[in-house]
Amino acid sequence: MPDSTVQQPITDDTELRRKNRATVEQYMRTKGQDRLRRHELFTEDGSGGLWTTDTGAPIVISGKAKLAEHAVWSLKCFPDWEWYNVKVFETDDPNHIWVECDGHGKILFPGYPEGYYENHFLHSFELQDGKVKRNREFMNVFQQLRALGIPVPHIKREGIPA
């Protein structure tokens, strides 16, 4: 009697994981003028942005053309920015990678004095076949306020055993 069991193809995510991780690592090590080409790591409809802001609403830049424009702005405002202490974490989903890192450099926002900005960051990368579909950046917005010389309120947390 013939075997009527349908064989399911074996899927191996190893190559996809390698490709996606290489993209994330390239994104995180990109510095200087090379940042003007970082949008090439994204899908055509890809997005990136800052999910922790002073308004509470994310700043999202969508599409390769807008990401290219954002790179010009970013290089002007953060001319010597670099990520360091980069740790890459793969997840159960080969298309989702998290990064924990630190970043530092000059901050040159119009209307504020030149400052030096340091912060700790988390990045969520959602990928599609080795290209970034969505990058979300999370950081402590108070550190950016301090770097711009903006007074930060103090929260009284009485009773916390620290």
Swiss-Prot record:
Pfam families: PHZA_PHZB (PF03284). Signal peptide: none annotated. The keyword Cell cycle does not apply. Coiled coil: none annotated. One of its GO terms (biological process) is antibiotic biosynthetic process. Keywords: Antibiotic biosynthesis, Virulence. Involved in the biosynthesis of the antibiotic, phenazine, a nitrogen-containing heterocyclic molecule having important roles in virulence, competition and biological control. Belongs to the PhzA/PhzB family. This is Phenazine biosynthesis protein PhzB. The lineage of its organism: Bacteria, Pseudomonadati, Pseudomonadota, Gammaproteobacteria, Pseudomonadales. The gene is phzB.
